[in-house]
Amino acid sequence: MTSRFMLIFAAISGFIFVALGAFGAHVLSKTMGAVEMGWIQTGLEYQAFHTLAILGLAVAMQRRISIWFYWSSVFLALGTVLFSGSLYCLALSHLRLWAFVTPVGGVSFLAGWALMLVGAIRLKRKGVSHE
C-alpha cells in the first residue's frame, strides 16, 4: 500500500464512517434494536480510530518510507474492513456467520499496531539534544 493508496483508503473510510453514522442516527435507530445499534456503534468507533491511524501512517510514509509502517497500514486497513464491516453486516443481516469474521479483524488490528510499534522503535533519532 503506497502512501497515496493509504490516503485514498482513509478518505473512503472516513466518508463511510460519517455517512453510516448519520444514517444510523437518523434512520437505523428507528428500526433496529439496542443490540444491533451497539454493534453499529462499536464498528463506527473502531473504524474512526483506525482510519485516523492509517491517515497518520500515510503522512509518516510521505516523510520516510518504512516497510514496518507499510505493513502496519495494510493490517489496519484489513482490520477495518473485517472488524467494522462484519459488525455492520451482522447488525443489518443477523447472519451469525459474520460473528466469526470479527475476531479476525481484531487480530489484524493488533498486528497493525504491533508493526507500527516496531516501525517507531526502529526509526533513527535525529540529532538528540540534551539541553
Curated annotation (Swiss-Prot):
Disulfide bonds: none annotated. Residues 1-4, 86-97 are periplasmic. One of its GO terms (cellular component) is plasma membrane. May be a peptide transporter or a protein that facilitates peptide internalization. Residues 26-64, 119-131 are cytoplasmic. Disruption phenotype: Mutants show a slight decrease in the internalization level of some proline-rich antimicrobial peptides of eukaryotic origin. The chain crosses the membrane at residues 5-25, 65-85, 98-118. It is a multi-pass membrane protein. This is UPF0382 inner membrane protein YgdD. Pfam families: DUF423 (PF04241). The keyword Transmembrane helix applies. It comes from Escherichia coli (strain K12). Keywords: Cell inner membrane, Cell membrane, Membrane, Transmembrane, Transmembrane helix. It is found in: Cell inner membrane. Belongs to the UPF0382 family. Signal peptide: none annotated.
